[in-house]
Amino acid sequence: MSDGGKTKTTVEIYGQSYTIIGQETKMHMRHVASIVDDKMREINEKNPYLDINKLAVLTAVNVVHDYLKLKEQYEKLEIQLKEKE
């Protein structure tokens, strides 16, 4: 459903349904939700005794860590490209 450039979709993350509204496509939002779900399940396999809140926070920390590593790699590549110009 698109309303004023916004898309609404329902996704399932770790057994819970969430309605998400954003400017990206439904496919993109579902892909993001799938990655979050996969990451939560991966962390839960290693730490099965975490409650849902701690699992969610640990997942967020891990995802931001991965994001920052990729951002750093991207910035290094940008510098290398500029040096070659």
Curated annotation (Swiss-Prot):
GO terms for cellular component: cell division site; cell septum; cytosol; plasma membrane. It comes from the Bacteria. InterPro entries: Bac_CellDiv_Activator, Cell_div_ZapA-like, Cell_div_ZapA-like_sf, Cell_div_ZapA_firmicutes. Residues 60-85 form a coiled coil. The keyword Electron transport does not apply. Pfam families: ZapA. One of its GO terms (biological process) is FtsZ-dependent cytokinesis. The keyword Cell division applies. It is found in: Cytoplasm. Keywords: Cell cycle, Cell division, Coiled coil, Cytoplasm, Septation. HAMAP family: ZapA_type2. Belongs to the ZapA family. Type 2 subfamily. Homodimer. Interacts with FtsZ. Activator of cell division through the inhibition of FtsZ GTPase activity, therefore promoting FtsZ assembly into bundles of protofilaments necessary for the formation of the division Z ring. It is recruited early at mid-cell but it is not essential for cell division. This is Cell division protein ZapA. It comes from Bacillus pumilus (strain SAFR-032).
